[in-house]
């Protein structure tokens, strides 16, 4: 930036991870840009497989039919735009595995409805599931700020179910990665936490047509 640097409204966790990765590759003697990007593409490809595995598990839990779950995983793996976009440097795709993991743990924390219509106890402790779901949702927000609406929707659903404790646990878990990662990074760069998030909101309020 010319002149005095100022916040631009970008979450810095994802660029920061790339900075550390490129520094590591430089230290290992890999300084060719094309080879560096091959490494980046491979890491993104491996990370995108979380979507396939988690999508399979979500479909299996919702349908109780292995065939439906298998087809769901197959579509997630092969549907034309998924493999193409998953290896790109797109925060929309990089945050997707975190959202899928959050959805999975939310499902695990909600009692299942059996064939008799009675709710069975959740397979694992609800508190643990909600905490993990919140942490993964918070990590997704660290990558792409707009995913805050996913976390907001999940929190609202818990409130509508009158699960007050669960909503507090989930909300607290969402805030934890934001405070530790984005808050710390902004504090280090700008001397105040959450500067980039505030700038993002301010810019969009001032430029609603962009």
Regions found by a protein language model. Name each.
Residues 4-31, 93:
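Short hydrophobic/aromatic helix or loop-helix immediately within or flanking a transmembrane segment
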Residues 30-31, 51-69, 108-111:
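Transmembrane alpha-helical segments of multipass membrane enzymes and assembly factors
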Residues 38-63, 101:
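Transmembrane-helix motifs of polytopic, lipid-linked glycan transferases
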Residues 48, 76, 95-103, 132, ...:
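Hydrophobic core segments of transmembrane alpha-helices in multi-pass, intramembrane catalytic enzymes
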Residues 63, 102-130:
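Membrane-interface transmembrane helices that cradle and orient dolichyl/undecaprenyl
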Residues 69-80, 137, 141:
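Short helix- or helix-capping micro-motifs
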Residues 84-94:
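Short acidic/glycine- and proline-prone juxtamembrane loop motifs at membrane-interface regions
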Residues 140, 148-210:
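Membrane-lumen/periplasm interface segments of specific transmembrane helices
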